[in-house]
Amino acid sequence: MLPSIRVGLGTDVHPIEAGRPCWLLCLLFDDADGCAGHSDGDVAAHALCDALLSAAGMGDIGEVFGTGLPQWRGVSGADMLRHVHSMMTAEGLRVGNAAVQVIGNRPKIGPRRAEAQRVLSGILGAPVSVSATTTDGLGLTGRGEGLAAIATALVVGDEGKG
């Protein structure tokens, strides 16, 4: 039987909230303010969740972790990814690989890129690449008002799964 191969895309954007811890890529960055949100505000983890859910045909992050679901209030991006991964494996699906790009001025990702890739790959049991870019001062990320992330994921399962 041939494997079923699916690709998903996810995005997330949050405003920055002064004084809030900055969780990004499942890492705590002490040198920047974090993002507002129902959870920890980790836009990279959220974009990855959306990409995985999309590829798996399991809806989206709002469906699974919606603000109307109090049990997910304050949840970490790492725990969200673990939950999505668990949902997928229960359906016979696995992550082939994933990529996430953070869009914003701060925090600087480069010095912790390898660490982020190790953490994310460990959670998902597959290679995860991390990149970052700025918007050259344009838009809410360029003005430092928020952070955004875009992610892709390749999901593999038995034929007919997902």
Swiss-Prot record:
Keywords: Isoprene biosynthesis, Lyase, Metal-binding. It is an enzyme of class 4 (lyase). Its cofactor is a divalent metal cation. It catalyses: 4-CDP-2-C-methyl-D-erythritol 2-phosphate = 2-C-methyl-D-erythritol 2,4-cyclic diphosphate + CMP. InterPro entries: MECDP_synthase, MECDP_synthase_CS, MECDP_synthase_sf. GO terms for biological process: isopentenyl diphosphate biosynthetic process, methylerythritol 4-phosphate pathway; terpenoid biosynthetic process. It holds the Pfam family YgbB. Signal peptide: none annotated. 4-CDP-2-C-methyl-D-erythritol 2-phosphate binds at residues 12-14, 38-39, 60-62, 133-136, 143. Binds 1 divalent metal cation per subunit. Pathway: Isoprenoid biosynthesis; isopentenyl diphosphate biosynthesis via DXP pathway; isopentenyl diphosphate from 1-deoxy-D-xylulose 5-phosphate: step 4/6. The keyword Lyase applies. Its EC number is 4.6.1.12. Belongs to the IspF family. Involved in the biosynthesis of isopentenyl diphosphate (IPP) and dimethylallyl diphosphate (DMAPP), two major building blocks of isoprenoid compounds. Catalyzes the conversion of 4-diphosphocytidyl-2-C-methyl-D-erythritol 2-phosphate (CDP-ME2P) to 2-C-methyl-D-erythritol 2,4-cyclodiphosphate (ME-CPP) with a corresponding release of cytidine 5-monophosphate (CMP). This is 2-C-methyl-D-erythritol 2,4-cyclodiphosphate synthase.
